[in-house]
Design a protein with these regions (language model features):
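Residues that define the transmembrane beta-barrel architecture of outer-membrane proteins
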Residues: 1, 31-35, 42-44, 61-65, ...
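Internal metal/ion-chelating core segments
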Residues: 1-50
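Repeated loop/turn-to-beta-strand initiation elements of outer-membrane beta-barrel proteins
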Residues: 8-17, 45-49, 76-82, 145-151, ...
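Transmembrane beta-strands of outer-membrane beta-barrel pores
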Residues: 20-26, 43, 52-56, 73, ...
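Extracellular/periplasmic loop regions
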Residues: 47, 51-52, 60-142, 148-150
Length: 190
């Protein structure tokens, strides 16, 4: 189940999206209930995007948290927005009988965690992974004719912070050609 609740009193385009899902596998130990809520809030130049979800069953106890706070800079020609973010995907503790790794079986998995396809921080099928803790800073800038430049810095580690996966710098140029077509070119340093 999914609800889309507009919060126009906060700002145009603001909404929350609570959801409930019951996922069933043939093997009972992989089935779980998921409860969560996404929020996309805009107030003047301040932007907030967040999500929290829990997966729960007899053996599964996992969660995810995503917080992004941004500033939309309408008064500058060259700067579009600045955003700081934190993503925490719970990881499994092999010392317990419970499965604590959050499964992104139905989600974007690695899509929002930088561009580099680094194996250690993109494996979120199932519940036995180390999880992820990501800090990021992003700036979107007007660049050349009708193009945008995204500069993003990411810091990745396991959920418990014991395994450092590394840092990433993204430089991405995007140009909208029409309503149906855009091009994207980028460099990624890991």
């Amino acid at each position: 189940m999914y609800w889309d609740i507009n919060l126009t009193g906060i700002g145009e385009g603001s909404k929350v999206e609570p959801y409930i899902m019951n996922y069933q596998q043939v093997q009972d130990n992989g089935s779980y209930n998921m409860f969560g809520c996404r929020a996309d809030l805009k107030r003047n130049s301040i932007l907030f995007e967040g999500e929290f979800a829990m997966q729960s069953s007899r053996r599964i106890k996992a969660n995810i948290l995503s917080l992004n706070l941004g500033y939309k800079a309408d008064q500058f020609n060259w700067l579009k927005s600045l955003t700081a973010g934190l993503d925490i995907v719970s990881g499994d503790d092999p010392g317990t009988d419970d499965l604590e790794g959050f499964s992104k079986y139905f989600g974007a998995r690695h899509k929002h965690h930088g561009y580099y396809d680094y194996g250690l921080h993109k494996k979120y099928f199932g519940h036995t992974h180390e999880g992820l803790q990501e800090l990021n800073l992003k700036g979107r800038f007007n660049f050349l004719a009708d193009s945008n430049l995204l500069v993003a810095v990411h810091n990745f580690s396991s959920h418990d912070g014991k395994t450092a996966y590394g840092n990433e710098l993204d430089l991405i140029i995007k140009r909208k050609v029409s309503d149906d077509l855009s091009s994207e070119f980028g460099l990624v340093f890991y």
